Amino acid sequence: ETCPSYYRDASAEASIDDTADFLHAVSAMPGNNGQVMPVITPRFIPTCSDAALRGLGDLAAETGAHVQTHCSEDDWEHAHVQRRCGMSDTAALQDFGLLTDKTILAHSTFIDDDDMAMIAAAGSGVAHCPLSNVFFSNAVFPLRRALEKGLHVGLGTDISGGPAASLMDTARMTAIASRMLEEGVDASLRAGARGVPSSRVDFRTAFW
């Protein structure tokens, strides 16, 4: 229902079969020798059927392939998954078998402490995309809290989500966004109620 008819797979089975063929084709490329790894990529839960998600989770378990997908990027996605699945995006991905130690979750702006615990336990990683989040995510990812909870977090440029594909620019924006989260942005609120204390990270943390 959230994907136009001209952009849909013929069926969940066809999607899974095509993905399996893709995994094999990339792995079998002459001279690859594991240097290029294929990735299972359900774009995000709203554009995938339950059957497709579960099948891709089974395929990930069978092949040991990496997984990348969006997770709790914005208000709409976060609320959509809650309504559809009765649980958070993170919990739903875990239920579908897509939360593994080879999973990268893009954005994850709205994850809470319970989600962070699941992600850490699974050994999954988060791709923090601060510049893209400014345009699309409706909030700032709580990077410092995620690091303190033991999450693996890397930087993502999300090339379609902003004007720069530079990781150095992304590192700068990471530090800036963390300051905005800590200090707050609504000047009508008093200082103590405006932000989230102890949220900032310095550029050294952002870079590494």
What annotation goes with each model-predicted range?
Residues 1, 129, 156-158:
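Generic beta-sheet signal
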Residues 2-4, 132, 161:
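Acidic, glycine-rich active-site loops and adjacent beta-strand->loop/helix elements
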Residues 9, 13-16, 46, 50, ...:
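Electropositive phosphate-/nucleotide-binding environments in soluble metabolic enzymes
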Residues 57-66, 98-101, 118-127, 148-153:
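Glycine-enriched alpha-helix->loop->beta-strand junction motifs that scaffold or abut catalytic
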Residues 133-134, 197:
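Short, contiguous acidic/charged loop-to-helix segments that flank catalytic cores in large enzymes
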